[in-house]
């Protein structure tokens, strides 16, 4: 399957999602405390982003660019990259309403057109990290990073994908698919995403000059409720198994 076809399908899916959910919630995300995933676990609890003062950053698959907004507020110089014009338009509206400004680039997360070694931080929270083939976007992230720079990204957990039925049903408590060979998942109108097993991801990161520093497996906190829009797992399920992962790696 040509990546351009997948990108077009994902652009359509996120244009729809922006109309249904992300546009009306973008401003609150821009102005809120930095947080991760569907359970909105604060970065202050996880300690992932750290001190970014003066750093050049690239967000791959930025969507409405709230992560880039957090970085800009913290003193970084972010660039947001996304393929969906509707979401970039929402990001520009949020810029106008908040006064927070940074460059936005309409491009594929694995073909940004940005210069080599131009970033101290490459970050993706459910952006290119799942919507672009990792064999395309991870080499691009490595190309963008300077030596010593960090790659930080969030994706679905492996166990949540293995327990996810075909279609739009939520993860179950039984395995629904084999782990061997997992990579590309076509969810129809919901888009095409990419998930690989831990061992394969470790090999891919290391092959691109990236040393893994942390892997965080996130569970739903006590009192969390199932997300109103991103309901791929229930809160009850995610209190028992991790639904999301954050990876942190550093460029050699």
Model-derived features with residue positions:
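A short acidic, Gly/Pro-enriched loop at the edge of an enzyme's catalytic core
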Residues: 110-121
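A short SAM/SAH-binding and catalytic strip from SAM-dependent methyltransferases
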Residues: 121-135
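Class I SAM-dependent methyltransferase SAM/SAH-binding core
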Residues: 56-111
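Conserved alpha-helix/loop element of class I SAM-dependent methyltransferases that forms part
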Residues: 26-55
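N-terminal, positively charged/glycine-rich alpha-helical extensions of SAM-dependent methyltransferases
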Residues: 1-28, 32
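Conserved class I S-adenosyl-L-methionine
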Residues: 150-183
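A short glycine-rich, Lys/Arg-flanked "PGG" loop and its adjoining helix->strand segment in the class I
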Residues: 135-150
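Short alpha-helix
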Residues: 191-215
């Amino acid at each position: 399957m040509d990546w351009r076809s997948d990108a077009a399908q994902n652009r359509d899916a996120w244009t729809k999602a922006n109309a249904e959910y992300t546009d009306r919630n973008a401003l609150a995300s821009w102005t809120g405390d930095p947080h991760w995933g569907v359970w909105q676990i604060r970065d202050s609890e996880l300690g992932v982003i750290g001190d970014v003062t003066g750093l050049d950053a690239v967000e791959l698959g930025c969507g409405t660019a709230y992560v880039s907004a957090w970085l800009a507020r913290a003193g970084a110089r972010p660039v947001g990259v996304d393929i969906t014009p509707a979401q970039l338009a929402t990001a520009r509206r949020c810029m106008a309403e908040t006064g927070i400004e940074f460059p936005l680039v309409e491009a594929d997360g694995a073909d940004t057109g940005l210069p080599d070694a131009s970033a101290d931080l490459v970050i993706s929270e459910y952006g290119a990290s799942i919507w672009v083939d990792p064999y395309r976007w991870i080499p691009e992230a490595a190309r963008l990073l300077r030596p010593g720079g960090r790659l930080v990204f969030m994706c679905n957990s492996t166990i949540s994908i293995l327990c996810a039925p075909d279609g739009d049903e939520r993860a179950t408590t039984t395995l629904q698919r084999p782990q061997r060979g997992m990579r590309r998942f076509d969810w129809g109108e919901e888009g095409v995403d990419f998930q690989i097993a831990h061992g394969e991801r470790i090999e891919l990161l290391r092959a691109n000059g990236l040393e893994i520093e942390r892997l965080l497996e996130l569970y739903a906190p006590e009192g969390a409720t199932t997300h109103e829009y991103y309901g791929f797992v229930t809160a009850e399920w995610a209190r028992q198994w991790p639904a999301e992962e954050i990876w942190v790696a550093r460029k050699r």
